[in-house]
Amino acid sequence: MSLLTEVETYVLSIVPSGPLKAEIAQRLEDVFAGKNTDLEALMEWLKTRPILSPLTKGILGFVFTLTVPSERGLQRRRFVQNALNGNGDPNNMDRAVKLYKKLKREITFHGAKEVALSYSTGALASCMGLIYNRMGTVTTEVAFGLVCATCEQIADSQHRSHRQMVTTTNPLIRHENRMVLASTTAKAMEQMAGSSEQAAEAMEVASQARQMVQAMRTIGTHPSSSAGLKDDLLENLQAYQKRMGVQMQRFK
């Protein structure tokens, strides 16, 4: 796996699923391929994106700045600086300085990532802030190692909380989660459908599913009534794709 592929993988792992994630993935691909060279426009676009947490925006801004060639005097962006200040905690800053000194001795991506993984997310963000604000310099490879270690920690905690939700025995939470998943699956089907004859069929299935979820929420239904809803939808989507000549084995 190439270095940039690895960076893209880690960064996208902390972006919530949805149309915005697809858009960010495309921007990252363009940046890494050298197709997007307007850093200012890129940062302006990032700043106004909804849904993303300030820290995620800060990390993306840091990655864009590392990758896109820019004039030396280009201003640093406040929204990135604020996100990478470790919540203003002096302890984070102290640890970030210690980590920075260790990173200065590293020359490889994996070496930097290993060193960084033993620090807290706050210290890692502060260390990125040091580098972003030009208070310290490390090689791009080492900076990417720091980025990936931070993303790994964030993704780990997201995964733990997601697992808690998925394995919860509370039937109401499970019911709501199934309805949310069915609804977002329906939305994805509508976006993928395009404008062929079979597309009308897929759109109809998706639309019915969304109406059903709406009705279930309005009248309040038994928590088990949503079981299998998303799987039924996905089966429909795969049947539609087969007719279109697209073979996607795994959506579940």
UniProtKB/Swiss-Prot annotation:
Q: Kindly state the positions of the motif Nuclear localization signal in this protein.
A: 101-105
GO molecular function, a single term: structural constituent of virion
Q: Name one Pfam family in it.
A: Flu_M1
User: Which residues does UniProt assign to the signal peptide?
Assistant: none
Residue span of region RNP-binding: 165-252
UniProt record, GO biological process: viral budding from plasma membrane
Per UniProt, the keywords (alphabetical) are: Host nucleus, Membrane, RNA-binding, Viral matrix protein, Virion
- Bilayer topology annotation: Peripheral membrane protein
Q: Where is this region: Membrane-binding?
A: 1-164
- Any one cellular-component term (Gene Ontology): virion membrane
- Provide the protein's localization: Virion membrane; Host nucleus
Q: What else is known?
A: Most abundant protein in virion. When expressed alone can form virus-like particles in transfected cells.
The protein's assembly and partners? Homodimer and homomultimer. Interacts with NEP. Binds ribonucleocapsid by both interacting with genomic RNA and NP protein. May interact with HA and NA. Cannot bind NP without genomic RNA.
Function text: Plays critical roles in virus replication, from virus entry and uncoating to assembly and budding of the virus particle. M1 binding to ribonucleocapsids (RNPs) in nucleus seems to inhibit viral transcription. Interaction of viral NEP with M1-RNP is thought to promote nuclear export of the complex, which is targeted to the virion assembly site at the apical plasma membrane in polarized epithelial cells. Interactions with NA and HA may bring M1, a non-raft-associated protein, into lipid rafts. Forms a continuous shell on the inner side of the lipid bilayer in virion, where it binds the RNP. Determines the virion's shape: spherical or filamentous. Clinical isolates of influenza are characterized by the presence of significant proportion of filamentous virions, whereas after multiple passage on eggs or cell culture, virions have only spherical morphology. Filamentous virions are thought to be important to infect neighboring cells, and spherical virions more suited to spread through aerosol between hosts organisms.
Give the family this protein belongs to, as stated in its UniProt record.
Belongs to the influenza viruses Matrix protein M1 family.
Q: What is this protein called?
A: Matrix protein 1
Native organism? Influenza A virus (strain A/Chicken/Scotland/1959 H5N1)
Organism lineage: Viruses, Riboviria, Orthornavirae, Negarnaviricota, Polyploviricotina
